[in-house]
């Protein structure tokens, strides 16, 4: 029997191959990074170069689900569109029913459940996306969650998905500290530094979105990103000079 063709059948050694193939599709996607600060949540994604005549605004990897929640994804854009639309409808339905916005965990659990159903149904295939979902609950607590094609989800302080996830995660494990997220600017810089581990062409290929407590989602413009990149480069040079003086 061909176990890699059947979605709902386990192989003898316990694998669901279609789910594993979906996870491989995620690893080929653009890198996305999320960091939860003290008063801010930040998502950054690696922008792939677009065709000369293509409108850049139509190529978005970060999108709002509700006023207090937004997400970034890695993997198949068409699959992400379905998940995003379903999640937005659920956010609206929740608001109409209970007259309150969703919590970040609620909508993450909804997305994870949707993905899980597609690993157990005939005539369907798993969604080839992982998502970083961030936002604030009504009490002002910042949240960051990650879901994968199998339907699992976990809360994180900082995480990365996509093709450069391994090296970015190693960077975050090394550099994420309470001091590194002490201010909003430091949190934003941490995300940019993490992305610069895999993005070769500097700030022009980075897309960044921030949400502060009780404030709407803000997409940073290229000039703001370049300013942060310039500050990071300056700090690097100063640190190198200090090292040289010590030696």
UniProtKB/Swiss-Prot annotation:
SMART domains: Proteasome_A_N. Pfam families: Proteasome, Proteasome_A_N. One of its GO terms (cellular component) is proteasome core complex. The keyword Lipid metabolism does not apply. The gene is psma7-b. Belongs to the peptidase T1A family. The proteasome is a multicatalytic proteinase complex which is characterized by its ability to cleave peptides with Arg, Phe, Tyr, Leu, and Glu adjacent to the leaving group at neutral or slightly basic pH. The proteasome has an ATP-dependent proteolytic activity. Its main location: cytoplasm. This is Proteasome subunit alpha type-7-B. Coiled coil: none annotated. It comes from Xenopus laevis (African clawed frog). The keyword Cytoplasm applies. Keywords: Cytoplasm, Nucleus, Phosphoprotein, Proteasome. The 26S proteasome consists of a 20S proteasome core and two 19S regulatory subunits. The 20S proteasome core is composed of 28 subunits that are arranged in four stacked rings, resulting in a barrel-shaped structure. The two end rings are each formed by seven alpha subunits, and the two central rings are each formed by seven beta subunits. The catalytic chamber with the active sites is on the inside of the barrel. Phosphorylated in G2 phase. It is found in: Cytoplasm; Nucleus.
């Amino acid at each position: 029997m061909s176990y890699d063709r059947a979605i709902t059948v386990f192989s003898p050694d316990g694998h669901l191959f279609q789910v594993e193939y979906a996870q491989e599709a995620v690893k080929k996607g653009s890198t996305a990074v999320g960091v939860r600060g003290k008063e801010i949540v930040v998502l950054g994604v690696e922008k792939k170069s677009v065709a000369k005549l293509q409108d850049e605004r139509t190529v978005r990897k970060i999108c709002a689900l509700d006023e207090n929640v937004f997400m970034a994804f890695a993997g198949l854009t068409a699959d992400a569109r379905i998940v995003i639309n379903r999640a937005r409808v659920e956010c609206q339905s929740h608001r109409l029913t209970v007259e309150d916005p969703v919590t970040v965990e609620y909508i993450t659990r909804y997305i994870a459940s949707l993905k899980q159903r597609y690993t157990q149904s005939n005539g369907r295939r798993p969604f080839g996306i992982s998502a970083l979902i961030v936002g604030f609950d009504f009490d002002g607590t910042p949240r960051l969650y990650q879901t994968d094609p199998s339907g699992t989800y976990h809360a994180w302080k900082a995480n990365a998905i996509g093709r450069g996830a391994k090296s970015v995660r190693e960077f975050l494990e090394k550099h994420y500290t309470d001091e590194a997220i002490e201010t909003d600017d430091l949190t934003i810089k941490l995300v940019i530094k993490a992305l610069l581990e895999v993005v070769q062409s500097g700030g022009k290929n980075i897309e960044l979105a921030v949400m502060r407590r009780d404030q709407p989602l803000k997409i940073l413009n290229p000039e703001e990103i370049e300013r942060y990149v310039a500050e990071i480069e300056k700090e690097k040079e100063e640190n190198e000079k200090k090292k040289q003086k010590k030696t």
